[in-house]
Amino acid sequence: MKKTKTYQVFCIAALSVLTLQLINGSSAATPPPPNSNSSTSCNRACGGVSIPFPFGIGKDCYLNGWYEVICNTSTSGSSGTTVPFLSRINSEVVNISLPDGKKLYGVVHIKGPVTSLGCSSSSSSSQVSEMSLPNLNVTGRGSPYFLTDENCLVMVGCGTKALMKDIESEILGCESSCEDSKSSEEVTNSKCDGYKCCQARIPLERPQVIGINIENTSATRGKEGCSVAFLTNKRYAPMNVTEPEQFHAGGYAVVELGWYFDTSDSRYRNPLGCRNMTRYSSYSSFDKCSCEYDYFSGMSYRICYCNYGYTGNPYLRHGCIDIDECEGHHNCGEGTCVNMPGTHSCEPKITKPEKASVLQGVLISLGVLLFVLGILGLYKFIKKRTRIIRNKNFFKRNGGLLLKQQLITKNGNVDMSRIFSSKELKKATDNFSMNRVLGQGGQGTVYKGMLAEGRIVAVKRSKVVGEGKMEEFINEVVLLSQINHRNIVKLLGCCLETEVPVLVYEYIPNGDLFKRLHEKSESNDYTMTWEVRLRIAIEIAGALSYMHSAASIPIYHRDIKTTNILLDEKYRAKVSDFGTSRSITIAQTHLTTLVAGTFGYMDPEYFLSSQYTDKSDVYSFGVVLVELITGEKPLSRKRIGN
C-alpha cells in the first residue's frame, strides 16, 4: 500500500512539471496560416499515414509543438519501415482526420498502452496491483487533445477489476468474474458484460487520465491467470470474449483522441476566407469553408471545417476545393450530371422527339441564314452589275468611243501610260475635297492628289460638258499622249468611268508664271532675275517649236499665256492646258473653229480671218515675252488713258 501511494505522488509531480511546460508552450502567438501550395517541401506522409496541417514533420511544417510528428524507423516491423509518433505525448499515430460538417473536431487515433496482471512468468503469482505509466495524460493545460466519448475502458480476465484514475481520484472501473459452470462455446460467444470481460464508458467531465490500475479480487490469483485492461475506441473493443494473452501479446490498444484548433485569433482566421457561422445556420454553396464556436472542458474555441461539397484542409489558405460529384456515383440516374461549386445538378436527358425538334430548329435556322446570305449576295451582285453598266455608260458619254476612234485614226501612235479607276482617284483626292483644289480654269478644276504608291499628282476634273464639247476633251488626251518634252506637262493617264472626265498629270509644285510675275506674297520669295526670265522664255520657245515642228503631227496650242506656263521645283517652264489645242495634217493649213484663246494674247488677224496658224501661237508668245520684260499685264486699266 505504501508503494502505491509513493507511485501516486510521483505521478502528481510529473504531471505538475508537464503542466508548466504546457503553459509556456501555449503562450506563443498563433502564426498566420500557410498557403495550400506553400508547404510542398514538407513531408505529408509517414508509414502510409497522411499528416495534414496543423500536424507536420520537420521544422516550419507544423503549427506548434503539440502537432509535431516524428517519423521514426520501426524496430518491430520489416527493415526500413517508418512509423509516425506524436512528439509531445510520445504515442504512435494510427491515423489523423480533419474536422468536417458532421464532427466539429478532428480525430487522431493512437496506440495506447495495455496494462496487464499475471501475464508474465515473473508476475504470474503476484497478488499486488499493476498500473500503466501516465502516458495518456493528453488533456493538460494548453493541450489540444481530449478523450472522446467514443472510447471505453475494457478489462479482460478473471477475478480482477480495472480502475481508471486521474490526478484527483478514481474515475470509473469495472469488475469481471469467471464461472466454471459455463461451457467453452458459451464463453466464446458471450459478450463483454462481466463474465471474463467488462467495459465502462468514459465521462467527458473527468477526462484527465493518469493510468489504469488492475486489482485482484480473487483469493486464488494463480488460478485466475492473466488479466489485461486498456482504453480503446468502441470500434476496436472486443465484441466477444477473447483470451487476455492475445491483447498482452499485441502490446497496444487503439485510442481515439479528439483535437481542436483554436482559430479565435482573427489574425489567423481572416486569411482563411471562411465564413463565420453559428450552429444550425445555413451557408451558400459558394462558401468553401466555415468556422464556428464550440465549447469543451470549460473553454470556448472556434474551429473550422470544409463545407459540404468541398474537401481538403480548412486550416490552409484555399485549402478547401470543390468535389466533382459527377466523377463518381451520383443520383442523376438517366439524367446528365452537371458539376457546380459545392454541389451538382441533374439536367434532363434529351429524348428522341426532343432531338428531332432541336434538329428541326437547327435546319430552319440554317435555312433562314442561307436565305439572308443569298439575298445579300444577290444585292451585291446587282449593285456590282449596276456599277459596271454605269461605268460603261460614263465611258461612252465621256468620249470613250471617240477616244478609241482617235486611236485608230492615229494608227496607234497614242501611248496612254495608265487608265485610272474612279475608286483610285477618289481615294487619292479625299473624294475630290475642296481642300485639295490647286486651281480652276475654263476647262475644269485641278486637285492635288497622292496615289497609293505615294506619287503626288495633279488631277484635272473637267467641268460638265455636253456632247458638242466632248471632242475638246478627247483632243487634249490625244495631243498630250503624243507629246514627250521636258517643257510640256506630261499626262500620266485618264479616267472615263466618272460622271465627268478626269485627267491625271504630273504634279508641278511652284504654280504658274502669272503669279510669280504679278502677285507679291511671302510664298513668292524666288527672285525673277533677268537670267531666270531669259531661261523661261527660251524654254517656252522650245516647247512651241516642238509642238509646231517636231511633233508627229503639228499642234497649235491656241491659248499661250502666263497662267498656262507652270514652274517645276527647279523653276523650269512647263506648258500646260491643251483644252483648245488642235492638230493639223500636212494638207490642211488651217481649221475654221469658234474663237479660242484669251483676250490680250490673241492674234488680231485671227479676229478678222478666224484662221488660227502657228503664227497665232507665236504672237501669244510675243505677248508673254513683253510680260516677262516689263512685268506688266497684257490688259490693264492703268494704260487705258494711254
Curated annotation (Swiss-Prot):
Pfam families named in the record: GUB_WAK_bind, Pkinase, WAK
EC number of this enzyme: 2.7.11.-
Residues the entry annotates as binding ATP: 438-446, 460
Positions bearing Phosphothreonine: 593, 598
MF annotations from Gene Ontology: ATP binding; polysaccharide binding; protein serine kinase activity; protein serine/threonine kinase activity
Segments on the Cytoplasmic side according to the record's topology features: 379-642
Disulfide-bond pairs as recorded: 291-304, 326-337, 332-346
Keyword set, alphabetical order: ATP-binding, Disulfide bond, Glycoprotein, Kinase, Membrane, Nucleotide-binding, Phosphoprotein, Serine/threonine-protein kinase, Signal, Transferase, Transmembrane, Transmembrane helix
Alphabetized InterPro entries for the sequence: Kinase-like_dom_sf, Prot_kinase_dom, Ser/Thr_kinase_AS, WAK, WAK-like, WAK_GUB
Subcellular location: Membrane
GO cellular component, as recorded: membrane; plant-type cell wall
Membrane topology (UniProt): Single-pass type I membrane protein
Family matches, as Gene3D superfamilies: Laminin, Phosphorylase Kinase, domain 1, Transferase(Phosphotransferase) domain 1
Chain's role: Serine/threonine-protein kinase that may function as a signaling receptor of extracellular matrix component.
Domain comment (free text): The EGF-like region is specific to this family of proteins and seems to consist of the C-terminal of an EGF-like domain fused to the N-terminal of another one.
Protein name as it appears in the record: Wall-associated receptor kinase-like 6
